[in-house]
Amino acid sequence: MILAGDIGGTKTAIALFDDSADELRLVRDGTFPSKDHGSLEEILARFLQGHEGPSLRAGCFGVAGAVIEGKCQTTNLPWHLEEEALARAIGAAHVRLLNDL
């Protein structure tokens, strides 16, 4: 399973994909008002609540802000994101943050 997201100042869109076949299959997705939450970890916990499928292998999140050595201070939210902390939060071996340009 792969978790992907677009982290914006207004909304955060999250999607969970099954990667066990040749093509990715959307399992579920959701959108959350970013400013109603104190952190991305809070949103991810809410999104994953009740998930009983296979464990997550990886996560990837597009963010507004420079990503330096796996860390990002978002430009339009008071959030500090770190790949390692996010990986621990979702129980995945790998997480990447990407600047969304």
What are these regions (language model features)?
Residues 2-46:
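Short glycine-rich, Thr/Ser-proximal phosphate-binding strand/loop in the N-terminal lobe
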Residues 51-97, 101:
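Short beta-strand-loop/turn "lid" adjacent to the catalytic site in phosphate-handling enzymes
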Residues 1-5, 58-61:
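Short glycine- and Lys/Arg-enriched binding-loop motifs that mark or flank ligand-binding interfaces
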